[in-house]
Amino acid sequence: MKRLDIYPARPFIKWVGGKTQLLDDIKKILPRDLSRRDEMTYIEPFVGGGAVLFWILQEYPNITRAIINDINAELICTYRVIKHDVENLIFELNRLQNEYLPLNEVDRKEYFLVQRERFNERDTSEVETAALFIFLNRTCFNGLYRVNSKGKFNVPHGRYANPKICDEETLRADSAVLQRVEILCGDFAQTGKYAHDNVLFYFDPPYRPLTDTSCLLYTSPSPRDAHES
């Protein structure tokens, strides 16, 4: 059994570079007395899919506060909606799931492209944005997040027989864990002001492209709110 499987809260999306498979190795390099330290704060400047975040907050209940950050505004919007409005998010995801799953392959691709265009128009509510973010992640090719030079999400449709678009149990468990998490969006350096003696930082920055011609952009300039929740 993988270390994260024993807990209900876990990553709500697939994410390139996610650390679910490495949690045992990460635990080995944590301070040996971490579980005995009172009122710890955990800070993750590049949260991504949150595998370490969700695991460590369930493994170490003495970590009473966490601060996460990411420069990807749509990802952070999704974290905030899960924290503050998870039931409306579940409602919207169930709607997308119920519309998508009965379709044949051709119609699924067309439906995917329509939702991708909605997402790229950036004219949706926060709940709709979060739902589209998760829907696209669950139905696109390999769960990639990639945007072009204009900041448009451009990953093609994937071919999955029965993707789990709305995982209600995980979303509710994640929402419960996120109640003790402060959520920031922007440059990772802003987390430095929270450093003090009882803080554990975990750094896992995004990967650089393999070549100069690679177009695997993690984010792009966005008008979305970049202030803390």
Specify the residue positions occupied by each region the protein language model found.
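A mid-sequence, solvent-exposed acidic-amphipathic segment
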Residues: 171-196, 202
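Class I S-adenosyl-L-methionine-dependent methyltransferase module
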Residues: 58-179
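Glycine-rich phosphate-binding loop signature in dinucleotide/nucleotide-binding domains
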Residues: 33-37, 194-198
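Short helix-terminating capping/connector loops at secondary-structure junctions
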Residues: 35-40, 62-63
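Single conserved hydrophobic/aromatic residue that forms the stacking wall/gate
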Residues: 218-229
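Mobile active-site "lid"/loop adjacent to the S-adenosyl-L-methionine
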Residues: 147-157, 207-220
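Conserved proline-anchored active-site loop of SAM-dependent methyltransferases
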Residues: 42-56, 68-72, 134-141, 186-188, ...
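S-adenosyl-L-methionine
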Residues: 1-35
